[in-house]
Amino acid sequence: MSRLYPERPWIGVLAAVRRGPRCLLARRGEGADAGNWGFIGGQLELGETVLDCAARELLEETAIVAEPRGVLTAFDRIERDAEGRVRFHFTLVTVLLDWQEGEGELCEPQHVTGLGWYTPEEAEAAGIPLSRRALELMRLALGHS
């Protein structure tokens, strides 16, 4: 299924990984968010739970192992073109994970071009371009027990 002008919503899963007072942010290499910093993520596969998807995408893209804790939140991202047609429609489920091991590698550089651990304040102060809702989701993840 094409992500542009799709027939139905595309289900994506974001991995909100926390390590102490920081969350892992990744600079996206492609797609609607290319160049922006946000959470690792990918497409939910048939027969896969959202928790397993978050852990799998994280491991595939960064070689980091983390324990899924549960669903943090879900939201839609819908964009229409000038004629009002749906250009893309993502339903994004954010999963909270606790870091276990791995320092992070750029295993799939076409998808992820940078990695860093940030508090929300550090991310703001760094002046890096952030994905929509990244700070809100970081604060939610870090405030969740």
Regions found by a protein language model. Give the residues of each.
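Short hydrophobic/aromatic beta-strand or adjacent loop that forms the aromatic wall/cage
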Residues: 10-14, 90-94, 112
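Conserved hydrophobic "DFG−1" position in protein kinase catalytic cores
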Residues: 17, 25, 97-99, 117
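Conserved Nudix-box catalytic region and its N-terminal flanking loop in Nudix hydrolases
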Residues: 19-60, 64
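A short coil-to-beta-strand element that immediately follows conserved catalytic motifs
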Residues: 65-74
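Active-site-adjacent beta-strand/loop module that shapes the phosphate/pyrophosphate-binding cleft
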Residues: 76-104
